[in-house]
């Protein structure tokens, strides 16, 4: 919205772009869920989630909760940047109700994805749709999301989960990082996005 308004200068008539209209739909949907109270601006992080995506799957760890989700056929043509963003959406939808009224640090090893979510800007329509869906879930549950880029070498648990094979060695590695992991069955429907916002 703001980019369009800034680019118009002093023109009196502005032709609304599709992106502008999607932003308006986002606000319209948000207002239906909004209860009028916001608890944002927490001083410290309450929860940390680490995520990773690869061409085989998505993985995340939050506290002792973990998941692995194989990439569905209709997403196998996506690049790694898109898969990383989809994984953040899946994590936000999965854990959002548990994070209500808290500040959450999302650690991701993809710098481009972190930049989109921190700056709120991208020219990629798919990334923009994912970002709006992430922000919609965060707004619905009054979650303040902050993002941090971490190098892949510092993200071993999520990396292991994204490449999960159910092999004995995977379980041994996981148990060295997480005591008594709680496996979540992530519903494939969480990959669906509202493309109208």
Can you annotate each of these PLM segments?
Residues 53-56, 63-66, 109-111, 150-153:
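An acidic- and aromatic-residue-enriched active-site/binding cleft used to recognize and process polar
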Residues 1-2, 27, 50-52, 60, ...:
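Mobile genetic element proteins and their domesticated derivatives, centered on retroelements
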Residues 63-86, 94, 111-128:
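A short, polar/acidic, helix/strand-boundary loop motif
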Residues 143, 160-197:
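Flexible, low-complexity interdomain linkers flanking nucleic-acid-processing modules
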Residues 41-55:
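Two-metal-ion RNase H-like nuclease active-site motif
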Residues 33-37, 46, 91-93, 132-134:
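Eukaryotic intrinsically disordered and solvent-exposed regulatory patches
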Residues 93-156:
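RNase H catalytic domain
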Residues 1-39:
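C-terminal reverse transcriptase regions that engage the nucleic-acid substrate
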